[in-house]
Amino acid sequence: MRRSFARIACVLALCAFIEVLPASLRGAALEKINASYGAISGSMLPIWVTKEAKLFEKQGLELNLVYISGGPRAIMSLIGGSVQFVNHSGMPALEAYQRGADTALIASPMNQLEHSLVVQKNISSVEQLRGKILGMSTAGSLTDILLREGLRLNGIAEKDVTILPVGDLGARLSALQTGRLHGVIVAGVQTLTATKMGFKQLIDFSKLPIEISGSGILVRRAYVMRNQETTLKFLKAWIEGIYLVKTKPEFSLGVLRKYGATQDVEVLNSIYGHYKDKLDTKPIPLGRVAKSMFYLLSRTNPEIPSGNPEGFVDARFINQLESAGFFDEMNRQYGK
């Protein structure tokens, strides 16, 4: 009889042990989800690192990660249901929210501008931009909105320049090299790439009085409310990816080399150092940042419906993780 009880106790202990193992180690089927990222930029390093380190699998998720250039296209994919999570600037999703969509910002590790206007080396002042042709990614994108506002804050009206949608960073720099454009807007350490090519930084957007969510996690409320556990698993994986970026430089640089469209060691090290220092390991989305983004949208798009931009922010999932001790666990594992 005692042997039977001992056997039962062993089986129960084994079951309990298996239950606390990550899904990837239990042999459980992984839940398939789709996510997109919106830039070939160091701001996307956390989701790239999370993917390459198999942290999504650790949480029981099989992530199909795709690149979608341009905020409006990414948000159309989100609303249409082809992706469940979007890692992108919050601006296009906020505009969709103000127009009645159920989009929300649930995490944001960076809330400052990191863009620059780089120009041909014969342009030495903002005044010389009058009559020039400038490039951004796509109409209505973050680069479009910021370029127009940056010009306005520096005393240049939109009517005084021509602004063209050109495409991703490679297309913009190529157009600058051929002389088709006189200036383009770039982000983060892309400025270093441009200056190494002989171009000049004319406007540093980080000095403007504006906050934005530059690389947040965007969702549809209908999806996350139906799939709260999946959402928490996604955030756990992605946030651990932020910790990994900050503590594992060699691995992170290898990932950056794979995704970042450059093999230049100086550029890679500069990108890594820049984002390692700026990423917040507790990425709480903030209402004041939503208000700042709405201000930007309304400056360039006056007919956008007014309302409550703070309602775009949903911090419940980050707050749940904090209450459950997740951040304490990460700090113990990786060091605060």
Describe each PLM feature range.
Residues 298-336:
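Conserved C-terminal helix/tail region of periplasmic/extracytoplasmic solute-binding proteins
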Residues 9-20:
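Bacterial N-terminal signal peptides
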